[in-house]
Amino acid sequence: MPLTLKQEDQVNVSLQSLPRHVAIIMDGNRRWHQQHQTQCTLKQTSGHYYGAKALPSIIESAFSLGIEVLTLFAFSTENFLRSTEEVEELFSLFHSQLDEQFPYLIENKIRLRCIGNLSALPLQLQQKISEISLKTHQNSHRDLVLAINYGGKDELVRAFKKLHQDLVEQKISSDSISEELIRLYLDTSEMPDPDLLIRTGGEMRVSNFLLWQIAYTELYVTDILWPDFKPNHFLDAIKAYQHRSRRGGR
């Protein structure tokens, strides 16, 4: 499907002051399931299925509007503590969503990137991620970033281990360590920090997501549960962002 967004939906959105990078914590799937149990069949044992159905319209809306990078918090390191059934269901949904979104990524020249400790994922899912990442790697103007088995603390630990190894091997010196150098060891080294972080579901926390990167990010929290999050809600977040004055900590 080509990149389209109805003009009437863009009312009061300035295309000159868009966030370059938007990140989303897609929260509320399980609460949605509890509220809509009569709609959930035995096969779809949680709201994750319905959360996955919300993805395409938000992805399309973001890139149609002109967002360059969209990062989605799909699966945290802590999510492995959930039931085996739920974890397996999530991995199955990831695999099917990658297949479904692949033609859209190709048609609209969007690159897939994945961040997190991917080595702990099922081999079949790792292979699917590698396949689509390779086939879209030349699409350099828009990035869809999936955070899978991702935790901000885990990312920093992995980064510092790599930095320490380079110190031991004398590839870098201790005097060269700076914010800029540390950034090069992060999963997100090749992308800008988020300008806007959207969290659905109403919880007022960042849940170990992009801890280094969101130091100066604008936060937008909505009570809308993720399966109910629609393009108009996404645009509400963009409008709210555009009414803020970013000071970068100053």
Swiss-Prot record:
Residue positions binding substrate: 28-32, 48, 76-78, 80, 82, 199, 205-207
Cofactor or coenzyme needed: Mg(2+)
Function (record text): Catalyzes the condensation of isopentenyl diphosphate (IPP) with allylic pyrophosphates generating different type of terpenoids.
Name of the protein: Isoprenyl transferase
Cofactor binding, note field: Binds 2 magnesium ions per subunit.
Gene Ontology MF, one: ditrans,polycis-polyprenyl diphosphate synthase [(2E,6E)-farnesyl diphosphate specific] activity
Gene Ontology terms describing biological process: polyprenol biosynthetic process
Domain of life: Bacteria
UniProtKB keywords: Magnesium, Metal-binding, Transferase
PROSITE patterns referenced in this protein's UniProt entry, alphabetically: UPP_SYNTHASE
Entry similarity comment: Belongs to the UPP synthase family.
